[in-house]
Amino acid sequence: MQENLKNDKLKIGKYEFDSRFILGSGKYSLELIKSSIEEAKAQIITLALRRANTGEIANILDYIPKNITLLPNTSGARNADEALRIARLSRELGCGELIKIEVISDSRYLLPDNYETIKACELLAKEGFTPLPYMHADLYAARAMRDVGAAAIMPLAAPIGSNKGLCAKEFIQILLNEIDLPIIVDAGIGTPAQACEAMQMGVSAVMVNTAIAEAKDIALMARAFSLAVNAGRAAFLAGLASVSEAKASSPLTGFLRD
């Protein structure tokens, strides 16, 4: 079993990773980012371009170890064209071609616009990006994103920043059943137990930001999430026992007559 875990890679397009825990960076102080990455044992960290201004002295890129893969996002984009402009800027800053597409035109609930996200996926894929669309868990939209070049699908578990957990669990399960791409649960995961539950379902990875950034001990919470993600993945690979009615684990009769 240890060998199975050792060879169990997260594959996104042409990229491979040992860790299945993706760390958000949107709410951290710069000083805590490095220690959080180390405790999380993460190999991917998301990056909002607004925090990577190369003219600032305290540039977030200076706090991220060089061996960590950056996953810049298009946070702030309200439509596909704006997402494309942000992605191009990301590439100019040297952040690579992996890009998390975030297109949100709703300022109240902060729900992703699946229609514009599909368009953004197509535009970015044509320009050589490896797009990972953040989306509301909908099978038809996920199929469309896959067909235009998405390398993975990132459905929300619950509204962003809510810490409500797997509210969209049944819809995520449909994506797992029908979409032959990595499914990465993003947004709404509030506890390590919820991250573990998502991994037990068979999702490829989990991304967490708010639940760690708002913890009293950020580094320790990052470690807790890392352990939970690993435990959930191991449980999925091991094969969970089926849910049934009461079933004795030891003989209930006969032993007194032996």
Swiss-Prot record:
InterPro entries xref list: Aldolase_TIM, Thiazole_synthase_ThiG, ThiG
Pathway it works in: Cofactor biosynthesis; thiamine diphosphate biosynthesis
Keywords of this entry: Cytoplasm, Schiff base, Thiamine biosynthesis, Transferase
Active site: K100 (schiff-base intermediate with dxp)
Keyword Transferase belongs to the record: yes
Cellular compartment(s): Cytoplasm
GO biological process: thiamine diphosphate biosynthetic process
Binding site for 1-deoxy-D-xylulose 5-phosphate: G161, A187, G188, N209, T210
Entry keyword Kinase: no
Entry-linked Pfam families: ThiG (PF05690)
Recorded GO MF terms: thiazole synthase activity
Enzyme Commission code: 2.8.1.10
One Gene Ontology cellular component annotation held by this UniProt entry: cytoplasm
CDD domains reported for this sequence: ThiG
Chemical reaction(s) catalysed: [ThiS sulfur-carrier protein]-C-terminal-Gly-aminoethanethioate + 2-iminoacetate + 1-deoxy-D-xylulose 5-phosphate = [ThiS sulfur-carrier protein]-C-terminal Gly-Gly + 2-[(2R,5Z)-2-carboxy-4-methylthiazol-5(2H)-ylidene]ethyl phosphate + 2 H2O + H(+)
Role according to the record: Catalyzes the rearrangement of 1-deoxy-D-xylulose 5-phosphate (DXP) to produce the thiazole phosphate moiety of thiamine. Sulfur is provided by the thiocarboxylate moiety of the carrier protein ThiS. In vitro, sulfur can be provided by H(2)S.
Complex and partners: Homotetramer. Forms heterodimers with either ThiH or ThiS.
Family from the record: Belongs to the ThiG family.
Name this polypeptide is given: Thiazole synthase
Species this protein is from: Campylobacter jejuni subsp. doylei (strain ATCC BAA-1458 / RM4099 / 269.97)
